[in-house]
Amino acid sequence: MKVLEGIVTAPNAKIAVVIARFNSFINESLLEGALDALKRIGQVKDENITLVRVPGAYELPLIARRLADSKKYDAIVALGTVIRGGTAHFEYVAGEASSGLGQVAMQAEIPVAFGVLTTENIEQAIERAGTKAGNKGAEAALVALEMVNLLAQIDKA
């Protein structure tokens, strides 16, 4: 039986990180985690990482699609935070960001790691950005690298 599993080291991978500015005080922690994971664990060279800032989580899919279509990147890491408020806005933004990023991955056939926090309150967001619940930015970066390696293995198999 042949078993394919990805690894998280990818020193030559070209990675785009797309980050929303809205809720930047949380997103910057996600970014720190993602960059640390890419460089320290994934051994990705600094010159192989491109950072793109967008206004909010709703804008992530369009920019991710443009980056994917450029064929310059092996994977995209999308980072942002959507916190539930008193209106339906949360559902629209969170749903469109999630659905849109998934569509980019499927249509462009490139890993798009979902590092967008969708939380009930600010406390949950802070916990997931590097305190009690780990750093979801770092986790998304490692998912991207593992998927790059797994797709390469499938192509060789």
From Swiss-Prot:
Protein keywords: Riboflavin biosynthesis, Transferase
Broad EC category: transferase
Active-site feature positions: 89
EC number: 2.5.1.78
Transmembrane helix in keyword set: no
Reactions listed under catalytic activity: (2S)-2-hydroxy-3-oxobutyl phosphate + 5-amino-6-(D-ribitylamino)uracil = 6,7-dimethyl-8-(1-D-ribityl)lumazine + phosphate + 2 H2O + H(+)
Pathway(s) served: Cofactor biosynthesis; riboflavin biosynthesis; riboflavin from 2-hydroxy-3-oxobutyl phosphate and 5-amino-6-(D-ribitylamino)uracil: step 1/2
Record-linked InterPro entries: LS, LS/RS, LS/RS_sf
Binding site for 5-amino-6-(D-ribitylamino)uracil: 22, 57-59, 81-83, 114
A Pfam family recorded for this sequence: DMRL_synthase
Transmembrane segments annotated in the record for this chain: none
Family classification: Belongs to the DMRL synthase family.
Role this protein plays: Catalyzes the formation of 6,7-dimethyl-8-ribityllumazine by condensation of 5-amino-6-(D-ribitylamino)uracil with 3,4-dihydroxy-2-butanone 4-phosphate. This is the penultimate step in the biosynthesis of riboflavin.
Protein's name according to its UniProt entry: 6,7-dimethyl-8-ribityllumazine synthase
The encoding gene: ribH
